[in-house]
């Protein structure tokens, strides 16, 4: 059958040639004609064999030598190794426009990256997150962190914090969009191999739903471009990254807000949120729930000069107390709630060679001012570890901060975090009511840039704080830290690029500990530690 097909194909292929050369063929002898036919048949058979072999290669796996080879472990090697197809640079997509064939091809080329982005946008789902994890050991037993909020994070961090966010677009038509967002955060213990949530004797393993809200665009006629949200969510946080605390933070149980509302030269963020607190009595054994509400208002992205923007912010927290709650405060020894506020401004300057610096000035009173006076973590909370207590008498505190990074030439980069703060007549969680304090903390992190993927440097941290209580007794807390590190990176920025893998050696020393009485293992005032840490966001 195959032979008959070959002959038939040969005749069909030669027919046009024979017809076009009829006049020439009439002058040839019979022998010459047979010779031409045999030559044409051989060429046709050769061509058909070529196509047949190519078809076989498509469906037959490539084989290796018939003798079975073994690998280093003595196992037989795979006689049919998988061939890896080269990743295409682009894909062809069909145009949906009806007149595409009139204007050109109905197909167009799209890079694989753009095609992947298109598919993600079409699905409308995104999964974002952050976590850190690592190993460390110290000279006196288990390594301990101390004063991260003053001495810096590198080589002083042994937690496994995570944030995981799920976002799904549920509507996007006619200029209106609706997204559902859920975020979980918490910590996974880095000390024991088991990390069950709820098995939390060491206080390490915990998780919460920190966000669960709906955000929209296009529903407000006066602000169609703004993000209007409702649910469990707070105003955006602003972090001093090297110290791991926030200059702007409004926690929320639930709320309603508007972000990126264009007004004049800048944008407005406004949020009204609920944040109930547990109000304790003076024994710190009994508590009652108090309903509080916060208004957080920010006017941001105000242009000043080239690559410089300004933000002005204000926050006010007020209680909505019941009669029984007020009675407990008046007659049963519960601490009185005092409304608290914070306002300030920040300036961000970006640099031509990359990098930035952010300067902020903040003033607060009552319980927020009390948190300005914390040397370890100094986020502007209204409580201390979730508990509201203390005799707040309207005292105020001031905070000045600087953070950022700058490139020096082609091979050096320096990051910084510097904070100066002071307060008068505040409630201190260490020295009580009517306390004054003054604090300075400074962390610098210079590094040599080997290439895009490698940096070697040192993080130097120092802080000192003095509190004076109502009787004018003075209490001092101070210390320093030196961390040598090498990092594997994906970009040269210290503060804005992740993932990052760090190898470090740290020496940390407590010079004075009159506020907290802290010691490392074996009652030592210093610690030498080595370790490795991975930090990633996506």
Swiss-Prot record:
SUPFAM superfamilies found in the cross-reference section: Porins
Chief place where the protein resides: membrane
Cellular component terms (Gene Ontology): cell outer membrane; pore complex
Pfam family membership, one: Sugarporin_N
Highest taxon, organism lineage: Bacteria
Keyword Acetylation carried by entry: no
Subcellular location: Cell outer membrane
Signal peptide range: 1-25
GO molecular function terms listed in the Swiss-Prot or TrEMBL record: carbohydrate transmembrane transporter activity; porin activity
Membrane topology: Multi-pass membrane protein
Keyword Signal set for record: yes
UniProt entry keywords in alphabetical sequence: Cell outer membrane, Ion transport, Membrane, Porin, Signal, Transmembrane, Transmembrane beta strand, Transport
Entry's transmembrane regions: none
GO BP: any one term: polysaccharide transport
Job description of the protein: May be a sugar porin with a broad carbohydrate specificity.
Family: Belongs to the porin LamB (TC 1.B.3) family.
Protein name per the record: Putative outer membrane porin BglH
Naturally occurring in which organism (per UniProt): Escherichia coli O6:K15:H31 (strain 536 / UPEC)
